[in-house]
Amino acid sequence: MKKNIGKITQIISAVVDVKFTNKGKLPQILNALECYNDKQRIVLEIAQHIGDDTVRCIAMNSTEGLVRGMEVVDTGSPISIPVGIETLGRIMNVVGEPIDGKGKIKGSSISSIYKSAPSFTQQSTDRNILVTGIKVVDLLAPYTKGGKIGLFGGAGVGKTVLIMELINNVAKAHGGYTVFAGVGERTREGNDLYHEMIDSGVINLEEPEKSKVALVYGQMNEPPGARARVALTGLTVAESFRDMNEGQDVLFFVDNIFRFTQAGSEVSALLGRIPSAVGYQPTLATDMGELQERITSTKHGSITSVQAIYVPADDLTDPAPATSFAHLDATTVLSRQIAELGIYPAVDPLDSTSQVLDPMIVGEEHYNVARKVQQILQTYKSLQDIIAILGMDELSEEDKLTVSRARKIQRFLSQPFHVAEVFTGAEGKFVNLADTIAGFKGLTEGKYDDLPEAAFYMVGTIEEALEKAKTLK
């Protein structure tokens, strides 16, 4: 079949205009075009048709070195990437090219990054708890298998560390496969994650097919087109694992979903669309919906997704984080005030929510303990103004006891992480759900009122707190 060839007529940053002279052969919207610059393959994705013979494209690679008059070939289909077992243990970029220096991904099947979401009849409605081993999450905002989880937080409060710990705790204990999509984050973190996975055995370099994870990176230095599409590339790999054989349970980590929105905003501005609120693209809700609706569980397999969501200027009402709220089953909100107290993970126990914190799903005891913990912490929060102005002495005996318990609960919500051992020197802890419930139940009932607050800081189970208390007395 004769190739459909066009020529570059205009280049403005990441936006490239291509003119096709074949009448009636204008490529479709979202088709991938290819051109070669010094033997390097450059992929362009069609975003708009301008007139009868010109298309406006978004570049997936750097446009450095491109010149007007260069030949461009229509591939006849959207961006397509390798999927399946062969991607395990490998790192790909947005267009499916390996970037780990280990050669071509051989023998894999090819799939378009654009697909429709599963129909209602295919979707599963089962609700099972996913135990993470992180006390504050398991107790107050539990995650579901096949659910969508958002980690909200401003700059530097620990979203990536929490994602790394979840990969460590859940992906290692988890039988299925894991896909990690690095969207517009630091290259250093992506490199650290890759080497940590090799050290921990999640990636097997000798026999890549025995690895548990596939990585897809489109980092901060990439053009906006790549950052706006790399989440779809990662999701396509995750969907292929979910639908394999008789179905699989897949974990899909995205760090960071805000960068997906941010890249969409840059692309939108480059294409000349009129911005909406706070300068975001007018299609913000549509873009987010197209991605999130595909992250779902079917009757064959499930995708459990954990998404880090950067919150600009710590403002949860910003359109980017606010748009993603509607799609999530559980939200874990990281708070700068809690991080300032030195309590890590800096999860806000009152702002974090979960649809499965329901006595019908988690059981009466878990639900009652969680609500009691939140009640004590809420009372302490409302008393803080009085304490700041008048001091502790002006409180009633009952309020003093509540404050004392709240401070112990606050410290007991902290926990040493496996992935932070290098920085803290403290051994990481995985706490079972039964131990978490028992520990907090004892605290709310006043069993440990005589122990010092420091005993509860950075420990795993309540038994460890009791041991620590002996060394403090």
UniProtKB/Swiss-Prot annotation:
One Pfam family, short name: ATP-synt_VA_C
Keyword Transport annotated: yes
GO molecular function annotation: ATP binding; ATP hydrolysis activity; proton-transporting ATP synthase activity, rotational mechanism
Keywords: ATP synthesis, ATP-binding, Cell inner membrane, Cell membrane, CF(1), Hydrogen ion transport, Ion transport, Membrane, Nucleotide-binding, Translocase, Transport
Entries under InterPro entries matching the protein: AAA+_ATPase, ATP-synt_VA_C, ATP_synth_F1_bsu, ATPase_a/bsu_AS, ATPase_alpha/beta_chains, ATPase_F1/V1/A1_a/bsu_N, ATPase_F1/V1/A1_a/bsu_N_sf, ATPase_F1/V1/A1_a/bsu_nucl-bd
Coiled coil: none
GO CC terms in record: plasma membrane; proton-transporting ATP synthase complex
EC number: 7.1.2.2
Subcellular location: Cell inner membrane
Binding residue positions for ATP: G153, G154, A155, G156, V157, G158, K159, T160
Main localisation: membrane
Topology of the protein relative to the lipid bilayer: Peripheral membrane protein
Catalysed reactions, semicolon-separated: ATP + H2O + 4 H(+)(in) = ADP + phosphate + 5 H(+)(out)
Self-association and partners: F-type ATPases have 2 components, CF(1) - the catalytic core - and CF(0) - the membrane proton channel. CF(1) has five subunits: alpha(3), beta(3), gamma(1), delta(1), epsilon(1). CF(0) has three main subunits: a(1), b(2) and c(9-12). The alpha and beta chains form an alternating ring which encloses part of the gamma chain. CF(1) is attached to CF(0) by a central stalk formed by the gamma and epsilon chains, while a peripheral stalk is formed by the delta and b chains.
The protein's role, per its UniProt record: Produces ATP from ADP in the presence of a proton gradient across the membrane. The catalytic sites are hosted primarily by the beta subunits.
Family indicated by similarity: Belongs to the ATPase alpha/beta chains family.
Record's protein name: ATP synthase subunit beta
Species per Swiss-Prot/TrEMBL record: Rickettsia bellii (strain RML369-C)
Taxonomic placement: Bacteria, Pseudomonadati, Pseudomonadota, Alphaproteobacteria, Rickettsiales
